[in-house]
A protein has these predicted regions:
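N-terminal helical cap/lid subdomain that shapes the substrate entry/recognition surface
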Residues: 2-11, 15-107, 114, 118-119
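Asp-based, Mg2+/Mn2+-dependent phosphohydrolase catalytic module
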Residues: 2-4, 114, 130-277
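Conserved G/P- and acidic residue-centered "switch" motifs that form tight phosphate/ATP-binding loops
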Residues: 10, 14, 127, 187
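Conserved long hydrophobic alpha-helices within structured protein cores
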Residues: 22, 26-27, 51-63, 126-138, ...
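Residue-level detector of short coil/turn "hinge" positions at structural boundaries
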Residues: 38-40, 69, 123, 145, ...
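N-terminal-biased segments
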Residues: 62-69, 122-128, 141, 150-153
Length: 277
């Protein structure tokens, strides 16, 4: 029996460079809307990106000083409700920014997704962001017709966010695909660690906030997937498999990476299908 390969994309920083003009802006507008005593700079947000998940980043604010300044009750259940409310508002703002076209798709995303679909590959997106945000970016990046072919794994469907491998282990299980037959496109060290932890070979397309991170476990590190138009060629930053990729990363390149034996990892996950992102 011939196995069907799968191409799994992260969302933020991979489909589009969403962090500074999308998520950061949406967080700060949410803080202002609710009168919260915080505003993140670009440098602040770069540190926040070490924490996987938007709700988790909001929860990191809840120091005793912040709780007092924001006039929040000490009851943790009420605090959790406040975080959920802030996060819903942030997601609405972010989705509106995506719909407004503030964040263009990164080079090569639509091209390689279309090529994979035409070749019969399984398509998926695995992200710690809220599902409405992920679907909005995906639709903007590849178009509604192609986006409908993607399986989306997002938000709180797993209890442990990246760099835990849970989201990728779940995706493989739900897609019915072995790690030998799947390849991931990521942009961050946390995402790479999650994918490699699930035994997946990974191509990293560095983004604005991740250029200086450690990608030593990646199968290939590039500036982008590239497109065959002036100014959109990829730059190969690390090529440990000696693929010798050209000005664009093609489905042939991904297939060659899949032909390389992977390192197997044991992963144990706990996921929640009932929790809304």
């Amino acid at each position: 029996m011939i196995s069907v390969p799968a191409l799994i994309f992260d969302c933020d920083g991979v489909l589009a460079d969403t962090e500074q003009d999308g998520h950061l802006r949406a967080f700060n507008e949410t803080f202002q809307h609710f009168g919260l005593p915080v505003s993140w700079s670009v440098a602040d947000y770069a540190e926040m990106l070490r924490i996987g998940g938007g709700k988790e980043r909001l929860r990191s604010l809840l120091t005793p000083q912040f709780i007092a300044a924001a006039d929040l009750p000490a009851d943790e259940s009420v605090q959790s409700q406040a975080i959920a409310t802030w996060h819903r508002n942030k997601t609405e703002i972010y989705t509106a920014l995506v719909d407004a076209g503030v964040m263009p798709a990164r080079p090569g995303i639509a091209r390689i997704a279309q090529a994979a679909s035409a070749a019969g590959w399984i398509l998926a997106c695995a992200s710690t962001s809220a599902e409405p945000s992920v679907r909005a970016v995906l639709t903007h990046a590849v178009g509604p017709k192609l986006a409908a072919k993607f399986s989306v794994f997002a938000g709180d469907i797993v209890s442990a966010k990246k760099p835990s491998p849970d989201i990728y282990v779940l995706a493989l299980s739900e897609l019915g695909v072995d790690a030998d037959d799947a390849i991931v496109i990521e942009d961050s060290e946390n995402g790479l660690r999650a994918a490699v932890g699930a035994g997946l070979r990974t191509v990293v397309t560095v983004s604005t906030f991740t250029a200086n991170e450690n990608f030593s476990d990646a199968s290939l590190v590039v500036s982008s997937l590239g497109d065959p138009i002036p100014g959109e060629a990829t730059r190969v930053l690390s090529d440990p498999l000696r693929l010798g990729a050209g000005s664009i990363i093609s489905l042939v390149d991904l297939s060659r990476i899949l032909a390389v034996p992977r390192i197997k990892h044991e992963s144990h996950i706990h996921y929640n299908r009932e929790v809304a992102p």
